[in-house]
A protein has these predicted regions:
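Short, flexible helix-loop junctions that flank or precede catalytic/ligand sites
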Residues: 1-260
Length: 260
């Protein structure tokens, strides 16, 4: 995550209540991000309870509950039980239905910080997904504090990474000249080793809340978020490609076809 985005994400984690969502396809690192956030929040003074399916990692000092649909313990049922234990932070492995979402909203309204995941292509699309589930727009506006969308790309190995001058058609197609002052503009190729995250962070603000109240579409929400400083997954990827972290091909592989 870029430095401004990381600072904004940590600011959202520092809030005493609200819903913070992490979204992306399967295998995009959502659970890892949530566990990292929980580790940061995990102090002796803070009571944290998770509801997961499955529990992927054991976190010391955190009460983690595995849902068991076969015996009637689903996400909604587990959440109803843990809210009575008055936790400070609740992590829901995934918001899958309206009932689970309503409990998350109510938990936020009663002073809990709620972390969870969705499967959407972008941060803005998560808002319309919640609306499609049947959550009232005013409840989303008053409880969702931020949404982090992410993708994983393969990282170029510095030992084999080679720079080359970006062709004019690629510069024009992707607007690379607006993203760097470097001349000539360089891109990179080589072998891959490890992975890097592309991120976009939507922070709820008054303009977005106003758009929510009139049921604006995801594109309008994203445009408003960009005016407030949101950097899209695609733009974050282009910047990483220009920095030699990954290749342009990798960025396009994971962001092409995204629509809001």
């Amino acid at each position: 995550m870029n430095d401004p985005g990381l600072a904004a994400f940590q600011d959202l984690l520092a809030r005493p209540h609200g819903i913070l969502l992490v979204t992306g396809p399967t295998g995009s690192g959502k659970t890892t991000t949530l566990y990292t956030a929980l580790s940061q929040l995990n102090t002796a003074e803070r009571k944290i309870i998770t509801v997961e399916d499955p529990v992927e990692y054991q976190l010391e000092g955190i009460n983690q509950i595995q849902v068991k649909p076969a015996i009637g313990l689903d996400f909604a049922g587990a959440l109803r039980a843990i809210v009575r234990q008055d936790p400070d932070v609740i992590m829901i492995g995934e918001i899958r239905d309206l009932e689970t979402c309503r409990i998350a909203v109510q938990s936020s309204l009663t002073g809990h910080l709620v972390l969870s995941t969705l499967h959407t292509n972008s941060a803005a699309a998560s808002i319309t997904r919640l609306l499609d589930m049947g959550v009232e727009s005013y409840l989303i506006a008053s409880t969702v504090s931020g949404i982090l969308a992410q993708r994983l790309v393969r990282r170029l190995d510095p030992a084999t990474r080679v720079a080359f001058q970006a062709p004019a058609e690629l510069i024009k197609e992707h607007g690379l000249d607006r993203l760097t002052e470097q001349r000539p503009i360089l891109l990179y190729r080589g072998d891959y080793h490890g992975r890097s995250a592309l991120t976009e962070l939507l922070v709820m603000n008054d303009e977005l809340r106003g758009l929510l109240m009139v049921h604006a579409d995801a594109a309008s929400l994203e445009h408003a978020a960009r005016r407030a400083g949101l950097r899209t997954l695609y733009e974050d990827g282009l910047r990483q490609a220009l920095a030699g972290v990954t290749s342009l091909e990798e960025v396009l592989r994971v962001t092409r076809g995204d629509d809001v």
